[in-house]
């Protein structure tokens, strides 16, 4: 979340206070739990905010943020109250508070989530106070900063104790005398990796289960001599492995400032492997569990702890060795592996669906908790109006919940209107008639960037817009109704283009270049490192390398010629356009989140499935007020089977708002925003006049069908509704 620090009157700075949750609040009533809410006051400034009330709990979760203007001498008081009692008398319902003095504010800024002990409002109060509150103070300065570890002891008023300090970009946790990372379940402090919170006094409650690795070494490295950050050779690009002063290993993505306990070299779903199947621990390692049951690992050699099982690295190393045919796995003379090279026999296959779940989770952490991205357009001018509205928004605004409205229509957007907007917009935006894109060849209808798009002086801004729309669709779980060439997706991933990528785009050119590589071209071809292409009826020349028109292609340099030709074929005149599109896409989808995917996988993530499997459709359809053997249901599927592919896609778009199917199939159709899970395609038999047309509820993926008397009438009414109607209304 990006926050711009502004000054008011030259003496105040803007900080964002996030009140995440509270834990272990005092229970004052024997028979019922409190309804806690938090109150935030900047003392003496008149600024006052209150969170939502959470019903019947001692562990409320708010995750709400507030922008505060804080002067150099201001303090912030955060108090928690029981909403059930605040109206009874003065001071009733008080559950605890914490006051941050000015020096505490300056030291706590940009240090991540901190857990603070709640205190009494006055030392003489009789009511007992207990529990903690988790908060963070953020400014723009945290991104990319390193800084030292913050020691916040003694900074809190009323002797309020800060649980643990942390440097910028560092996950929060706490070590006692025996290191024990601890988390109170997923999302306890922000819902994602790297937001871990430790409980005070954990040392006394920790019960570690110890399974020693063989030969624990006597010599250890002291924390004072340990490096606090380094770039491992096998870490993904942009990641650094770091160690806190307490000995915890974590990983920092230097470009975004996001930190995590999870080792990026280990696929997240690989952590579910049974520890018993992994063999013994390496020498000097020990496995322990926290009181919550989470397993962590202690490296006595370096005096560090981590959540990642060190044995999982053997699985990854083994897989990379299997992919490298020339790489020999060390084997002893008796055929067994050398010591320390154990790996499980089971193979690990990384599933696209699992990778997509990880991507969705990472993107959900980037979505602001408040506000909407509102788009209101007319169907007649959908392209230009969408362009103007999307381009004037900031990237962080585009990440808010998407709400689309068609001017003059009353439909409420719970997902279906947005899907229809994207469907109609893509039909205009990707149309070669506008000149931004063109078909790859005359008989292959995949899209590629038009090198002659510069005829429109604002074409780069439009490509930026296209990139934003693609990112918007992926970020909010929708699909783009259009297919690009495979090399386009490869470029979007930042991967180099190869000759084999040309086959699906231009088979004839691919065949010619392969022939050049496989045959002796001496005295056969008279080519130079200069190629010709047509632009607006003019024949232009392009040199593949300096002075290329005077450099003959020979048997010795033909590989270089083919490589340069392939690069030119895909990037001729489109470098600026592609960079503008990629910029817009990465404003919503950070590039590092795409690292695990291949080009075919990215194509499915952006475009979904364009082939409709009727058997899968039937198997994942819900029936309401009708049965599978009802005439209406049987006639409906009979009509679907009689449709061609285009009409089936149009029917799917009529009911769901999109012609595309999720890569998991119809079982993963998404419905209204915020639904607990997928919403299946639904056939609903309604009591209505049979002269009426079927109605669709795109937010619920539901089609309402009157009880038609015959198949012919159902077919006619269904076809009319699909092909002749448009617009949304509210019932």
Curated annotation (Swiss-Prot):
Span of domain WW: 233-266, 279-312
Classification via InterPro entries: C2_dom, C2_domain_sf, E3_ub_ligase_SMURF1, E3_ubiq-protein_ligase, HECT_dom, Hect_E3_ubiquitin_ligase, WW_dom, WW_dom_sf
Active site (catalytic residues): 699 (glycyl thioester intermediate)
Domain of life from the UniProt record: Eukaryota
Domain HECT: 394-731
Domain C2, chain residue ranges per copy: 1-120
GO terms assigned for molecular function: SMAD binding; ubiquitin protein ligase activity; ubiquitin-protein transferase activity
GO process annotations (BP): BMP signaling pathway; cell differentiation; ectoderm development; negative regulation of BMP signaling pathway; proteasome-mediated ubiquitin-dependent protein catabolic process; protein modification process; protein polyubiquitination; ubiquitin-dependent protein catabolic process
PROSITE patterns attached to this UniProt entry: C2, HECT, WW_DOMAIN_1, WW_DOMAIN_2
Segments for region (Disordered): 210-235
Catalyses which reaction(s): S-ubiquitinyl-[E2 ubiquitin-conjugating enzyme]-L-cysteine + [acceptor protein]-L-lysine = [E2 ubiquitin-conjugating enzyme]-L-cysteine + N(6)-ubiquitinyl-[acceptor protein]-L-lysine
KW Transferase (keyword) present: yes
Pathway: Protein modification; protein ubiquitination
Principal location listed in the UniProt entry: cytoplasm
Function: E3 ubiquitin-protein ligase that acts as a negative regulator of BMP signaling pathway. Mediates ubiquitination and degradation of smad1 and smad5, 2 receptor-regulated SMADs specific for the BMP pathway. Promotes ubiquitination and subsequent proteasomal degradation of TRAF family members and rhoa. May play a role in dendrite formation by melanocytes.
The protein's name in its UniProt record: E3 ubiquitin-protein ligase SMURF1
Organism for this UniProt entry: Xenopus laevis (African clawed frog)
Lineage: Eukaryota, Metazoa, Chordata, Craniata, Vertebrata
């Amino acid at each position: 979340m990006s926050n711009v620090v502004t000054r008011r009157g030259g003496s105040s700075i803007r900080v964002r206070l996030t009140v995440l949750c509270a834990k272990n609040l005092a229970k004052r009533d024997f028979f019922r739990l409190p309804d806690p809410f938090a109150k935030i006051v900047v003392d003496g400034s008149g600024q006052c905010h209150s969170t939502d009330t959470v019903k019947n709990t001692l562990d409320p979760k708010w995750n709400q943020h507030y922008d505060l203007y804080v002067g150099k001498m201001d303090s912030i008081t955060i108090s928690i109250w029981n909403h059930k009692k605040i109206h009874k008398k003065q001071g009733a319902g008080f559950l605890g508070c914490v006051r941050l003095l000015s020096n505490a504010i300056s030291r706590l800024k940009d240090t991540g989530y901190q857990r603070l002990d709640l205190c009494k409002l006055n030392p003489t109060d009789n009511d007992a106070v207990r529990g903690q509150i988790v908060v963070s103070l953020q400014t723009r300065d945290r991104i990319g900063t390193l800084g030292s570890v913050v020691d916040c002891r003694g900074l809190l008023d009323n002797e309020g104790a800060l649980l643990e300090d942390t440097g910028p970009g560092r996950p929060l946790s706490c070590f006692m005398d025996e290191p024990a990372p601890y988390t109170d379940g997923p999302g306890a402090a922000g819902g994602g990796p790297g937001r871990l919170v430790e409980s005070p006094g954990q040392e006394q409650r920790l019960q570690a289960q110890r399974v020693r690795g063989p030969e624990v070494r006597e010599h250890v490295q002291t924390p004072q001599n340990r490096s606090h950050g380094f770039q491992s050779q096998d870490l993904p690009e942009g990641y650094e492995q770091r160690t806190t002063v307490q000995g915890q290993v974590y990983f920092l993505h230097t470009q975004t400032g996001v930190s995590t306990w999870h080792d990026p070299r280990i696929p997240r779903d690989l952590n579910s492997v049974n520890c018993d199947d992994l063999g013994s621990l390496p020498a000097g390692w020990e496995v322990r569990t926290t009181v919550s049951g989470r397993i962590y690992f202690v490296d006595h050699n370096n005096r560090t702890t981590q959540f990642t099982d060190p044995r999982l690295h053997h699985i990854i190393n083994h897989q990379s060795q299997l992919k490298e045919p020339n790489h020999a796995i060390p084997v002893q003379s008796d055929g067994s592996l050398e010591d320390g090279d154990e790996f499980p026999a089971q193979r690990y296959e990384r599933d696209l669906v699992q990778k997509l779940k990880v991507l969705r989770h990472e993107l959900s952490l980037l979505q602001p908790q408040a506000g909407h991205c509102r788009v209101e357009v007319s169907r007649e001018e959908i392209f230009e109006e969408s362009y103007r509205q999307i381009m004037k928004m900031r990237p962080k605004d585009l990440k808010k919940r998407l709400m689309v409205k068609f001017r003059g229509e009353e439909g409420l957007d719970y997902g279906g209107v947005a899907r229809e907007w994207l469907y109609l917009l893509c039909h205009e935006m990707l149309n070669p008639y506008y000149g931004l894109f063109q078909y790859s060849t005359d008989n292959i209808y995949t899209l590629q960037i038009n090198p002659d798009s510069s005829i429109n002086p604002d074409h780069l801004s439009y490509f930026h817009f296209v990139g934003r729309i693609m990112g918007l669709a992926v970020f909010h779980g929708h699909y783009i109704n259009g297919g690009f060439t495979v090399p386009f997706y490869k470029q979007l991933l930042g991967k180099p283009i190869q000759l084999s990528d040309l086959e699906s785009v231009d088979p004839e050119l691919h065949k010619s270049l392969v022939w050049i590589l496989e045959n002796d071209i001496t005295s056969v071809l008279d080519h130079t490192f200069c190629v010709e292409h047509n632009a607006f009826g003019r024949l232009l020349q392009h040199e593949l390398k300096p002075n290329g028109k005077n450099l003959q292609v020979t048997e010795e340099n033909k590989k270089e010629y083919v490589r340069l030709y392939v690069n030119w074929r895909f990037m001729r005149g489109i470098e600026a356009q592609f960079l503008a599109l990629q910029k817009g896409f990465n404003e919503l989808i950070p590039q590092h989140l795409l690292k695990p995917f291949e080009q075919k996988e990215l194509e499915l993530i952006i475009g979904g499935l364009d082939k409709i499997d009727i058997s899968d459709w039937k198997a994942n359809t819900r029936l309401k007020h009708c049965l599978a053997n009802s005439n209406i249901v049987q006639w409906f599927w009979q009509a679907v089977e009689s449709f061609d592919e285009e009409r089936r896609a149009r029917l799917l778009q009529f009911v769901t708002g999109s012609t595309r199917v999720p890569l998991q199939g119809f079982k993963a159709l998404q419905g209204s925003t915020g639904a607990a899970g997928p919403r299946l395609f639904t056939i609903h038999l309604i009591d209505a006049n049979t002269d009426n047309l079927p109605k669709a509820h795109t937010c619920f993926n539901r089609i309402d069908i009157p009880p038609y008397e015959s198949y012919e009438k159902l077919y006619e009414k269904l076809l009319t509704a699909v092909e002749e109607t448009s617009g949304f209304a509210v019932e």
